[in-house]
Amino acid sequence: MSNVYWPLYEVFVRGKQGLSHRHVGSLHAADERMALENARDAYTRRSEGCSIWVVKASEIVASQPEERGEFFDPAESKVYRHPTFYTIPDGIEHM
């Protein structure tokens, strides 16, 4: 058995009817091309996808749920992002 470890890639597939990619799984591959081909073979067997993204797991940076308060607090001071000062015209029932 080899001691060589291939990097881990996260796989995102966009369905034919979808507008966004969704995470479908992970796989190990020697390079990006192999990751794309393996992702195609493993995650789009029934031709349900129209686009695949593969991203090295080591390159993904994410916020942590336990830091959400301090991370998202700066958005509270940007009142222009909240539609509270718009008036809704008469006759509009659902917005």
From Swiss-Prot:
Induction: Activated by cAMP receptor protein (CRP), integration host factor (IHF) and by phenylacetyl-coenzyme A (PA-CoA) that prevents PaaX from binding its target sequences. Inhibited by PaaX. This is 1,2-phenylacetyl-CoA epoxidase, subunit B. GO terms for cellular component: cytosol; phenylacetyl-CoA 1,2-epoxidase complex. One of its GO terms (biological process) is phenylacetate catabolic process. Pathway: Aromatic compound metabolism; phenylacetate degradation. Homotrimer. Forms a stable heterodimer with PaaC. Probably forms an oligomer with PaaAC. Signal peptide: none annotated. Component of 1,2-phenylacetyl-CoA epoxidase multicomponent enzyme system which catalyzes the reduction of phenylacetyl-CoA (PA-CoA) to form 1,2-epoxyphenylacetyl-CoA. The subunit B may play a regulatory role or be directly involved in electron transport.
